[in-house]
């Protein structure tokens, strides 16, 4: 990820659009006290606290419409941290959640990033409000710490403040940290020339719903969408600093699940239309496999390219974005969902509600 360049790109985007609204130990806060945003501390120096590698914490986010909790799946080693080495403390403060990495010995905060979750949206649905419990997988990634750390997850409250929800102690020398490399046989494809990962906005496309017999189409689609993306501002004028890669991820079946039509496909990521029974909402609910495949290449931003001609997609801030490959509006959908993913931008239109109670997402007196 580019250092100050990505900062300027995001600042430009967000000023002109509405914002949406042994070694391991964990603790879910039972009755937490609010966490103040506070003033920005002195910037931590990357080389003092982190190596060139990355740490991924895979989590389960579970609950109902009125309660939720996080639990640990596993901590995973990744070979390269491609992200910022300058803005280690998130300067924007966007998202319904944030995670903070704190040095265990000194309690100094050395990394912070905001994010949103699909689970937050589900909590407002009729299903969740009726008391049904569900779980979804999520991950947070950060540079590999040189010393033991504590990872804190804080949830934004209706008034904009944060409240602690979960904490996890991690010793980077622990033998419990997974170093397995699933899907290592999948090939990474370079889609455009660009600078090295620490000086680029690294964008990764993971194909979904492409069977082995679709390989030629997969290759064409990867290159077409990388090219289309760079034809639009603000990315066009910054394309020398943006690097696209793809992963040749194949599914057992072509296409994507469409439950309302009775179509259920066996695909590598298990993506599906009709998320939360919304007609066009296309998402990946369980993202563990997506993260495993994505770890094969450097990435700051993550696309899922779905082999379908039906209109639809989805995007979650600092998580992922999903678009379709063969619709007349596919280029628009790609760019639209990227705005959700990289900058937390809201929809530029509104024609249907996912949440059963819009006040849950946009509290009166707080938003707008």
Regions of interest found by a model, annotated:
Residues 2-14:
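Bacterial N-terminal signal peptides that target proteins for export
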Residues 11-23:
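Bacterial N-terminal signal peptides
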Residues 50-175:
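Beta-strand-enriched, solvent-exposed domains that form extended recognition/catalytic surfaces
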Residues 176-236, 246-256:
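Fold-level signature of zinc-dependent metallopeptidase catalytic domains
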Residues 241-317:
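Active-site-proximal segments of metallohydrolase catalytic domains
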Residues 314-335:
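Short pre-active-site segment immediately N-terminal to the catalytic Zn-binding motif
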Residues 332-348:
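Active-site recognition of the HExxH zinc-binding catalytic motif
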Residues 346-368:
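Post-HExxH zinc-binding segment in Zn-dependent metallohydrolases
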């Amino acid at each position: 990820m580019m250092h100050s360049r990505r900062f300027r790109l995001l600042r430009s985007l967000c000023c002109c659009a509405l914002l949406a609204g042994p070694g391991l130990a964990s603790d879910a806060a039972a009755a937490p006290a609010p966490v103040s945003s506070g003033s920005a501390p002195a910037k931590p120096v990357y080389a003092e606290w982190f190596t060139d590698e990355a740490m991924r914490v895979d989590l389960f986010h579970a609950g109902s419409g009125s309660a939720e909790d996080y639990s640990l799946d596993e901590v995973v080693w990744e070979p390269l941290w491609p992200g910022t080495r300058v803005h280690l403390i998130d300067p924007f403060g966007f998202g319904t959640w944030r995670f903070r990495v704190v040095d265990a010995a000194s309690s100094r905060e050395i990394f912070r990033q905001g994010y949103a979750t699909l689970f937050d949206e589900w909590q407002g649905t009729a299903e969740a409000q009726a008391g049904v419990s569900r779980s979804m997988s999520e991950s947070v990634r950060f540079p590999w710490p040189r010393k033991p750390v504590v990872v804190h997850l804080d949830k934004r409250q209706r008034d904009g403040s944060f409240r602690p929800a979960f904490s996890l102690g991690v010793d980077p020398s622990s033998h419990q940290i997974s170093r397995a490399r699933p899907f290592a046989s999948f090939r990474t494809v370079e889609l455009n020339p660009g600078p090295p990962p620490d000086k680029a906005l690294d964008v990764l496309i993971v194909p979904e719903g492409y069977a082995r017999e679709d390989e030629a189409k997969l290759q064409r689609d990867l290159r077409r969408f990388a090219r289309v993306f760079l034809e639009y501002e603000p990315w066009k004028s910054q394309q020398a600093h943006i690097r696209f890669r793809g992963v040749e991820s194949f599914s057992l079946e072509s296409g994507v699940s469409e439950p309302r039509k009775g179509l259920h496909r066996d695909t590598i990521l298990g993506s599906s239309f009709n998320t939360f029974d919304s007609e066009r909402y296309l998402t990946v609910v369980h993202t563990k496999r997506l993260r495993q495949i994505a770890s094969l290449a450097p990435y700051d931003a993550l696309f899922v390219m779905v082999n379908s001609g039906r209109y639809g997609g989805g995007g979650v801030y600092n998580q992922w974005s999903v678009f379709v490959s063969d619709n007349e509006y596919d280029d628009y959908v790609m760019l639209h969902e990227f705005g959700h993913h990289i900058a937390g931008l809201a929809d530029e239109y509104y024609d249907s509600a996912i949440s059963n109670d819009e006040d849950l997402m946009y509290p009166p007196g707080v938003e707008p």
